[in-house]
């Protein structure tokens, strides 16, 4: 069964998945607030961040959300974590949620500490959980656009919703694995960005592969510990939504979070690094939320804490590294 899909958010990530869904035979209407971007996509049939990609005819665009929703059998969101609440609030004013809503963004809301799925439930109400889905995993947008093999996970509370979303996204090269632990899937995608910043700092100081692999492994331990205390399944974080996504984000040359960390090591301030990258670096905001939650629940997360202190307490990076290296080495999995 082919879907009519409203895709909310036409940044590089949103465009890559909208393009994938259209190439999979679905009718897709992409929405963005920016009329100039919509005009360029509609007239030139090229995305400014990926001008080499031809846009299929069954992918159209609008800056009017009600037009995107017309006849939609599925809604997919691909906006930043900061944009999630205003976009879903606008969506709520236009429709009651009676079709699957697939969240593909990764992050934790500032101030509230809510996962993006929890924002959706707060806005639409608990009964909307039956329509909610979450897609996450190692998926660099530029590689998805090129049709490179990719494996992700999809989670949903309702088995029928899970099947519908799974069918819509699955292609010969975009492998979609079901996972019933929606909160674990969401947390893995959010927290890995903080560890990736630490890996970028390691790259900037040229500490080498041994140090980076240590950060990834110990970082995964922090993520798994955090998620388990939050009620998630530990094995979820050992899979694509945790380890897989963490590896891709930490080692990819296309990772904003890793590049951000590298720029910090080269002497740029956080604001200067964000300006140079020119796009949202989700790990900056997740570091604050994760630190606040970890402090409240007394979860020991030394790498996350160090990144937070560098970003928000002006901790000298060299001092932060020294503090990590001077920690006691206790039993590995404690």
Swiss-Prot record:
Record: residues binding sn-glycerol 3-phosphate: 106, 137, 139, 192, 245, 255-257
Catalytic activity from the UniProt record: sn-glycerol 3-phosphate + NAD(+) = dihydroxyacetone phosphate + NADH + H(+); sn-glycerol 3-phosphate + NADP(+) = dihydroxyacetone phosphate + NADPH + H(+)
Binding site for NADPH: 13, 33, 106, 141, 256, 280, 282
Subcellular localization, as worded in the UniProt entry: Cytoplasm
Enzyme Commission designation: 1.1.1.94
Record-linked Gene3D superfamilies: N-(1-d-carboxylethyl)-l-norvaline Dehydrogenase, domain 2, NAD(P)-binding Rossmann-like Domain
PROSITE patterns in alphabetical order: NAD_G3PDH
Gene Ontology molecular function, alphabetical: glycerol-3-phosphate dehydrogenase [NAD(P)+] activity; NAD binding
Biological process annotations from GO: carbohydrate metabolic process; glycerol-3-phosphate biosynthetic process; glycerol-3-phosphate catabolic process; glycerol-3-phosphate metabolic process; glycerophospholipid metabolic process; phospholipid biosynthetic process
Known pathway: Membrane lipid metabolism; glycerophospholipid metabolism
Active site: 192 (proton acceptor)
GO CC, any one term: cytosol
Keyword annotations: Cytoplasm, Lipid biosynthesis, Lipid metabolism, NAD, NADP, Nucleotide-binding, Oxidoreductase, Phospholipid biosynthesis, Phospholipid metabolism
Signal peptide start-end: none
Reported function: Catalyzes the reduction of the glycolytic intermediate dihydroxyacetone phosphate (DHAP) to sn-glycerol 3-phosphate (G3P), the key precursor for phospholipid synthesis.
Family: Belongs to the NAD-dependent glycerol-3-phosphate dehydrogenase family.
Name of this chain's protein: Glycerol-3-phosphate dehydrogenase [NAD(P)+]
Organism: Chlamydia trachomatis serovar D (strain ATCC VR-885 / DSM 19411 / UW-3/Cx)
